[in-house]
């Protein structure tokens, strides 16, 4: 499975959530609302999730292998670094 497009939109600065990304695979499937988050060890991506009735969050979709997660993270963060600082503007590859 190849990542064929990544779009990143920054959000307002001031908290750990830095941006949202949409990732397209093989020009036929898109994953929306992947989050770019700044943690204690740097930037990472968070998968789209929903809140359960007990208050916990559950991922809607996620990579199965560490290798594919790394591939997704690298692709998203490369585009994030190229994205204009102004929230609302979008960058893509």
UniProtKB/Swiss-Prot annotation:
NCBIfam families: PRK13259.1. It comes from the Bacteria. Belongs to the SpoVG family. Keywords: Cell cycle, Cell division, Septation. Could be involved in septation. One of its GO terms (biological process) is sporulation resulting in formation of a cellular spore. The keyword DNA repair does not apply. It comes from Treponema denticola (strain ATCC 35405 / DSM 14222 / CIP 103919 / JCM 8153 / KCTC 15104). This is Putative septation protein SpoVG.
């Amino acid at each position: 499975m190849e990542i064929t497009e990544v779009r990143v939109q920054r959000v307002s600065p001031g908290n750990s959530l830095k941006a949202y990304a949409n990732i397209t695979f093989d020009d036929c499937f898109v994953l929306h609302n992947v989050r770019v988050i700044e943690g204690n060890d740097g930037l990472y991506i968070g998968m789209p999730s929903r809140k359960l009735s007990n208050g916990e969050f559950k991922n809607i979709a996620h990579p199965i292998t560490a290798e594919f997660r790394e591939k997704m993270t690298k692709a998203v963060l490369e585009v994030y670094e190229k994205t204009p600082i102004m929230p609302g503007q979008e960058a893509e590859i």
